[in-house]
């Protein structure tokens, strides 16, 4: 019976000491987390700059912009024409009552 009580007491003390050690363990500070975050972002930025310098990526970007320009130019011209027509309609409405 004494052996059982001593075993339970020993296990309880060991588990409490383990919990105490875990609580006393040093948590990473906010400053170190922020510093680590900025270091990671900086590393990604450097990697990205190296990838952008490649001629293949530059050629792909140029082709994409040229294709976009070809597709958007007619739409912009049509939107400009529609806007001019819309505004001229209101100008005509405004001048008609004055002439009558």
UniProtKB/Swiss-Prot annotation:
Keywords: Cleavage on pair of basic residues, HDL, Lipid transport, Oxidation, Phosphoprotein, Secreted, Signal, Transport
InterPro entries (alphabetical): ApoA-II (IPR006801), ApoA-II_sf (IPR036172)
Signal peptide: 1-18
Localization: Secreted
Modified residues (Methionine sulfoxide): 49
Modified residues (Phosphoserine): 54, 68
One GO term describing the cellular component: chylomicron
Gene Ontology BP annotations: cellular response to lipoprotein particle stimulus; cholesterol efflux; cholesterol homeostasis; cholesterol metabolic process; diacylglycerol catabolic process; high-density lipoprotein particle assembly; high-density lipoprotein particle clearance; high-density lipoprotein particle remodeling
Phosphoprotein as UniProt keyword: yes
Annotated GO MF terms: apolipoprotein receptor binding; cholesterol binding; cholesterol transfer activity; enzyme binding; heat shock protein binding; high-density lipoprotein particle binding; high-density lipoprotein particle receptor binding; lipase inhibitor activity
Summary of subunit composition and partner proteins: Monomer. Interacts with NAXE and NDRG1.
Function: May stabilize HDL (high density lipoprotein) structure by its association with lipids, and affect the HDL metabolism.
Family listed: Belongs to the apolipoprotein A2 family.
Protein name as annotated: Apolipoprotein A-II
Organism of this sequence: Chlorocebus sabaeus
Gene: APOA2
């Amino acid at each position: 019976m004494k052996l059982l009580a001593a075993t339970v007491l020993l296990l309880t003390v060991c588990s409490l000491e383990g919990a105490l050690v875990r609580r006393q363990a040093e948590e990473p500070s906010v400053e170190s987390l922020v510093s680590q975050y900025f270091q990671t972002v900086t590393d990604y930025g450097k990697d990205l700059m190296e990838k952008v310098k490649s001629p293949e990526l530059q050629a792909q970007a140029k082709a994409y912009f040229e294709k976009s320009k070809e597709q958007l130019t007619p739409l912009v011209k049509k939107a400009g024409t529609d806007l001019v027509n819309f505004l001229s309609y209101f100008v005509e409405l405004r001048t008609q009552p004055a002439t009558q």
